[in-house]
């Protein structure tokens, strides 16, 4: 299936180079399009030309690219347009070994397949405590009953620790059961002035220490902590104290947008508004997948099918921009006039 996807990507990118009718095509583009169009016309009985000039010819070439995108992604889009019918035989065209594919396309598909079939350490973009259901007021003393050291969450990436005079305790527990981190990078600081429960202000005296695995860590410096070693805080002073611990970032096996080069840009290209026809076409295609149909996904996609669909659909969007096809989509009423931000914004409502 990787070679099928690589051929589809190669052919669509070759079509995206046809930005004017009299352009001098590169030799490899002529070879790719010559073989691909010949095989496609033979199996589908369509009349795609290598140099489309009329609207009908541009439509035919775009429909060929649409067929290839759907076949490579394994999507059966169904009846979405009175002007277009998906040719299921296109998969046979893409399976033809005579159609060459570029090194770039092959490498990109190999990256998609390789990265989605395994896991690796990645810097996560969200706060470590993002999914915490409750939070506490920052800078306000809080001590649970029968405790001398109490740690609470006070933000999506922050905890604060209240300590009685002379108290020592391990706050590792508050990090457990969250996000399955491989390494946590944190910074600790003394809260110079904090409010007691009664509302009066109190100072954290110098001398409070934070240690990882028994080694004291300097305040205001990034500490690499594996989440397993003891994270102890000691208040040797004779009055209450408070400490703030910020998770700068953490590394885990969760997939991110860095798993594939320019995945963020590909997603933006897919979900961008070009006109109402593209908006309806993209929505109809993504309705047959697990991806959202109008707005980008909340979390990075982590399976091969989703990322491959985004890559192929982004390339199809480029072809749409170049060929400027005009056809109808069921349920879509094209609007005339120039494209404005207000027009694009209204399409997502």
Curated annotation (Swiss-Prot):
GO terms for cellular component: viral envelope; viral outer capsid. GO terms for biological process: fusion of virus membrane with host plasma membrane. GO terms for molecular function: host cell surface receptor binding; structural molecule activity. Keywords: Capsid protein, Glycoprotein, Outer capsid protein, Virion. Transmembrane segments: none annotated. Glycans are attached at residue 287. It is found in: Virion. InterPro entries: Capsid_hemagglutn, Orbi_VP7_capsid, Orbi_VP7_capsid_C, Orbi_VP7_capsid_N, Virus_capsid_a-hlx_vir. The keyword Glycoprotein applies. The keyword Glycoprotein applies. It comes from the Viruses. Belongs to the orbivirus VP7 family. The VP7 protein is one of the five proteins (with VP1, VP3, VP4, and VP6) which form the inner capsid of the virus. Homotrimer that assemble in a complex of 260 capsomers on an inner scaffold composed of VP3. This is Core protein VP7.
């Amino acid at each position: 299936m990787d070679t099928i996807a690589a051929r589809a990507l190669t052919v669509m990118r070759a079509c995206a180079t046809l930005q004017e009718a009299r352009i001098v095509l590169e030799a490899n583009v002529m070879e790719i399009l010559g073989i691909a169009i010949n095989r496609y016309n033979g199996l589908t009985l369509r009349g795609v030309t290598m140099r489309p000039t009329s609207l009908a010819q541009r439509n035919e070439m775009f429909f060929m690219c649409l067929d290839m995108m759907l076949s490579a992604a394994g999507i059966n889009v169904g009846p979405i347009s009175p002007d277009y019918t998906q040719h299921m035989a296109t998969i046979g065209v893409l399976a033809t070994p005579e159609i060459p594919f570029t090194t770039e396309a092959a490498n990109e598909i190999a990256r998609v397949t390789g990265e989605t079939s395994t896991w690796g350490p990645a810097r996560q973009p969200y706060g470590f405590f993002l999914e915490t259901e409750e939070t506490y007021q920052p800078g306000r003393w809080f001590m649970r009953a029968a405790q001398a050291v109490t740690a609470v969450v006070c933000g999506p990436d922050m905890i604060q620790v209240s300590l009685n005079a002379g108290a020592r305790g391990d706050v590792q527990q508050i990090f457990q059961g969250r996000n399955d981190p491989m390494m946590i990078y944190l910074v600790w600081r003394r809260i110079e002035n904090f409010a007691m429960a009664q509302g009066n202000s109190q100072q954290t005296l110098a001398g409070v220490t934070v240690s990882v695995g028994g080694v004291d860590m300097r305040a205001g410096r990034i500490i690499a902590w594996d989440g397993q070693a003891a994270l102890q805080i000691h208040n040797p002073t004779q009055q209450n104290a408070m400490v703030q611990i910020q998770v700068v970032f953490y590394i885990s096996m969760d997939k991110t947008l860095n798993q594939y080069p320019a995945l963020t840009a590909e997603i933006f290209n897919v979900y961008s508004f070009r006109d109402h026809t593209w908006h309806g076409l993209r929505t109809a295609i993504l309705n047959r997948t697990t991806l959202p149909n109008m707005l980008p996904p909340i979390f990075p996609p982590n399976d091969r099918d989703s990322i491959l669909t985004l890559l192929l659909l982004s390339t199809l969007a480029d072809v749409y921009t170049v060929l400027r096809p005009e056809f109808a989509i069921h349920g879509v009423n094209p609007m005339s006039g120039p494209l404005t931000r207000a027009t694009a914004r209204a399409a997502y409502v």
